[in-house]
């Protein structure tokens, strides 16, 4: 395949849904689109894949216990199907990641254990499991177990002895009063001021992505989000001077991401 076939951002074959100032959004199935990205062209990947809660799961909405139905994209019929889904997208993501690049994957207990196993099965070495401790989690209305107040973010690189991933150790110390940054990050859920462009069920706060991007990339690095949703990764990447590709199969979410990219990020450390 000739290099000039990757004419969008120098790394992408498919015409984008949105392209402006080093930020690209693509309306596509991630499995199909990942095959059209230049191999070993991404410096970092952040993914917030489906949690698969829409199969009888319960949630808190306005103080009421309600069933979870985020859409067909969040439904799965069995554990085997879920794990196969995770192995497939991680396998494709590995192909587009540079030899020294890293991947971050966020999730809850409903999916993160499958993700962790899939990462190792597909040739990754897990560097950290970050615990995001939420200061204002939704209450546990059933009173049958502990309140879910954390999510896990896995950070990994290719399991190759020659791999030399980037970590901005000094900057992370600076953000932590001169002390080593620990793997427990405490902060609030996404602020209302970041949700102005529309509703998404799992929108991540900008401060989480800012820390991730600053810790593991440099200016002008390429960042990929294969489940871009409302576009938080792209918004923060753009503000920090990184190049970005975001993929999503849901056009309604891409509309939100487009609005946010056109306006810019609202948060800064």
UniProtKB/Swiss-Prot annotation:
GO molecular function, one term: DNA binding
One GO BP annotation of this record: methylation
InterPro entries (alphabetical): DNA_methylase_N4/N6, DNA_methylase_N6_adenine_CS, RM_Methyltransferase, SAM-dependent_MTases_sf
Pfam families on file: N6_N4_Mtase (PF01555)
Domain of life: Bacteria
Catalytic activity: a 2'-deoxyadenosine in DNA + S-adenosyl-L-methionine = an N(6)-methyl-2'-deoxyadenosine in DNA + S-adenosyl-L-homocysteine + H(+)
Annotated PROSITE patterns: N6_MTASE
Keywords, alphabetical: DNA-binding, Methyltransferase, Plasmid, Restriction system, S-adenosyl-L-methionine, Transferase
Assigned EC number: 2.1.1.72
Disulphides: none
GO cellular component: a single term: cytoplasm
UniProt miscellaneous comment: The LlaDCHI restriction system has two different methylases.
Free-text function comment from the UniProt entry: A beta subtype methylase, recognizes the double-stranded sequence 5'-GATC-3', methylates A-2 on both strands, and protects the DNA from cleavage by the LlaDCHI endonuclease.
Protein name listed in UniProt: Type II methyltransferase M2.LlaDCHI
Organism field: Lactococcus lactis subsp. cremoris
